[in-house]
Amino acid sequence: MIRNSKGFTLIELLIVVAIIGIIAAIAVPGLLRARMSGNEASAIGSLRAVNSSQLNYNVNCANNSGNAPSLANLVTPPLGGGQPFLSPDLDDTLGPPVKSGFTVTYTGTNPVVSALATCNGAAAGTVLADYLAVADPTAWGTSGNRHFGTSEAQTIFQEMTNAPITAISAAGVPVPATATPIK
């Protein structure tokens, strides 16, 4: 009796599945590292956007008297019309925004008491002399391996350990002191 052997044998199929598994095992860690690098680049971009919008806000909305009291104030357009100073995806009205695996938080200090009301409705005296914006990974080691922070001095710092940046002094020294500026 003649057998008509069309198709693949079980051994051939197992070899193909094993090869695909080996290729996947090699590729997946690289893809995860690339995703983490992309998340970190997005966090740096978000902090640069905060710095840029604060400068624009100070000059064009706060009469050179200081910085916005919140990210929500930066995403509010001027009362006379126009574009907001910051993208709405960083609005902190409902809590700290999460963007690309990083939580962006903003705190301000030292209200400028003599400041007038701003062009987008911030009350007189709510403009701030100092601010700290930080971007922390939502899952350390998964969404990012670095913490980032910036202040009114416009320098962005990175911390390579799992220790968030909690302050940047007027002299430009970050806390923790092991944080380094990004070039």
Each predicted region: which residue ranges?
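N-terminal single-pass transmembrane signal-anchor helix
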Residues: 3-31
